[in-house]
Amino acid sequence: MKHTIYALTMFALAACTSPQEEAIDRHALVTRNNPEVTAMDSLSSLSVGNGEFAYTVDATGLQTFPEVYKNGVPLGTQSQWGWHSFGNPENYKPEEALVEYDFGHGHKELYATQPKEPGRAKEASDWYRVNPHRLHLGIIGLELENEVRPSDVQNIQQSLDMWNGIITSRFTLKETPYHIQTVCHPERDMIAARLSARQPAGIKFHFPYPTGGHCDDACNWEANDKHSTTLVSEDAQSAVLKRTLDATTYYVTISWEGAAKLREKSANYFVLTPTDSVFTFPCQFTPQASASPILTFAEVQQASSGHWQNYWTQGAVADFSQCTDVRAKELERRVVLSQYLLAIQCAGSTPPQETGLT
């Protein structure tokens, strides 16, 4: 597949006409390929991120309906540092999952295996295949009434502005128009959102226990007894939550502009309810309690715009607008989107395997 894409790219470039050397209009190149979403589609989620942290949203611009997307492209919130291991009461050792093999190097070598026969070796192998696993740091979405269904979200107009790294979502819910902007800080594990609605909805912060599964949304909602979320500090404009899962801890710092009330709805489930029709909040995830200054939505948005404009104006890009091959437009779209996804999902300090952070 990789060779096919390379061949198509070379063929399309050969079909391009360039009567004179001209600088590529990078802004036009990027913005004409901005993704747009017009339906609640589990395969059309959008993401913001910075390589160290990524946050994926549904058509509301937040993670309002994670259950709808769990079998498609799940709504993840993940970081490079966010790892967890289940307890190891049987005290399995790494060497118990290894077997000696002769690979023709003149001596036997240890190799990790998956024993099929029941016994301690299989149990040890199974434990190490599951642990450690990356954590879903938490769902951040609209808190809606129980009877609201995804189909009630109408007139969806959502776009990802890759030039500035911001998702803009417009929709109506029970005849109320909503306008939500979502952005990620380029250097912190932080998202920020701006909500505008005549009847503002609350914001839910719902924290799952991990599943340890391979192809799921990493959310176990049936294990509240195995983890906790504690409100460790709060004032009129901010709150800090401490998450504890077995031996793993991390912190969630929420701040907001305007009047709002944070309440604990149930175990590992908090709701922030604003009173103003326009409401903004940043939310930061950290492995330790953070002493960093609290930022505003405007500051996060400004930092994101500067970061992404620098990203797109540095390094190589490919403009297919002068190509005569009918496949050129689609190929250009895939190249630009791949550059964006690479930056948010795979360009961190430890590039993740396969699909990226979320």
Feature locations, PLM:
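Acidic/polar, glycine-enriched structural segments that form the non-catalytic walls/loops
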Residues: P19-T358
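Sec-dependent signal peptide recognition
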Residues: K2-L8
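C-terminal motif of bacterial Sec signal peptides marking the signal peptidase cleavage site
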Residues: A14-A15
